[in-house]
Amino acid sequence: DTVKGLSPKGIRYLIATDYHGDHTTGSSFIDGIGEQVNFIAPQFAYDEILKGDNAFSKEIFVETLRDLGHTEEADAITRAAVPHPQFCFEDTMVLHLPPLTFEIRRMGGHSPATSAIFVPEEGVLFSSDVVSHTGGGMRDANLGEWIRALEWIESLPIKTIVPGHGDICGKDVATRQKERMVSIKGTMEEVLKKGLTKDETVADESFQKFFRADTSRGEYWLQQRKETFRIGIERVYDEVKADIG
């Protein structure tokens, strides 16, 4: 309702910046989606949505709500089908909507679909999970892509970042996140020198300092975060092993 009041024309475009449940589930509750409201998404997101709810972590989203006692909301989300985007892009798309321009760019990093939206006239970037106060989950990540995406953000003439999670911020948060990603890769490079197996490497205590989770979201969420963190470190292992040969 708040967004509707920003323009007499109401909502005209909805842009999904990822396929994860916290970026797609809300589209089920937008009046006129697919009709008055044009649904835009990266092709990667469209492909994942076609696979069904659990493919893009809707289950995690719903079960976290149940664990916190929000059963009515969880049931409503379970029943609501996520609509299919109508307009998709591989890498970039530009919306010319005078007086503003919306430059949409698939960045990758957090997931293959993760995209950002730059509004040059306002000096604003909607970064999705490329920038996140929580550091960002790595379950579907490629850290090399992520670091390059953050370097691109650092180069932009922007005053304001609307991150995927957390309060509106400046480029300092992007810089801190880049430093974190570089540190994770560097730690993996050092641990690999020990000659450990993949399982031993992933379990190495050196990585625990990078784990973050909002414990206020309940035990289910915490366990899911631990599991996705482990999967993320496995991905970093594969990525760094491939880099060093």
Feature locations, PLM:
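A generic secondary-structure signal
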Residues: 2-6, 149-152
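C-terminal regulatory/interaction regions
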Residues: 193-245
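Metallo-beta-lactamase
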Residues: 94, 101-190
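Active-site HxH/HxHxD metal-binding segment of metal-dependent hydrolases
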Residues: 4-87, 186
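Non-catalytic beta-strand/loop surface segments
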Residues: 87, 91-93
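Divalent metal-coordination and catalytic microenvironments
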Residues: 3, 18, 30, 39, ...
